[in-house]
């Protein structure tokens, strides 16, 4: 497989007034994909990719941004040909798709940022939607009685995301050197499944996650310490295929550290990864024949964990 691609573009920045700006751009993408081997063909693809990026400083503390942009996802050449699946003991080969097309989407994005008084932190919220066309998921490419699936274009799909972040210094409780950060992300998506004919989430699409962290500097002791907590919302992290279905679930992931400077500015740092000793699990449902027949043949559950990882580091100039 060989691809030749050209992307001429034009960009213009508009300063509408001291508080408003608008960036516009237009990219023209032309690509030619040539396939040779068991299957020979040459195909051309053209895309216009406009972008409108509007920014408005409502006040020195409040900023708004609105973005509309068209993006194109490039094809993975591996998806054109059959490949060996070393991770599946029951299926040796993943089929390819000679007629695969690039998929594209429109991104509608709104972001608001508020800088807290007395420079103690920032709160931001980002909400956006992606409207996909020629969306790529696995499709049925069976021949005769031999079941097979490959990556293919299945039509339209939509995704919505709300992402809220905070970063705050705890001045109001007399701890100006304590920085607390949070992030909450809520996500949903919808596409029509080519195997079951149902509306479902995108493959490997998580529902969201919650993150919390802090770092406390104590200059008088020449010390700092911190912790980060990351928890993915379980559910919907699923992969659909022609004869099986897989879901992933996992425990929160926690890291912590403490660092001290001594002996001519030498750093002594102790880190702990996976402090909660969490595990990640995969559940797999293997069906006899096509998944639409819902004849369960095998259920498999695998869990693994790395255990806690402790690290002690000494660094400095000697």
Language-model-derived ranges and their functions:
Residues 1-4, 72-131, 142-169, 205-206, ...:
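Outer-membrane beta-barrel signature, preferentially recognizing the C-terminal barrel domain
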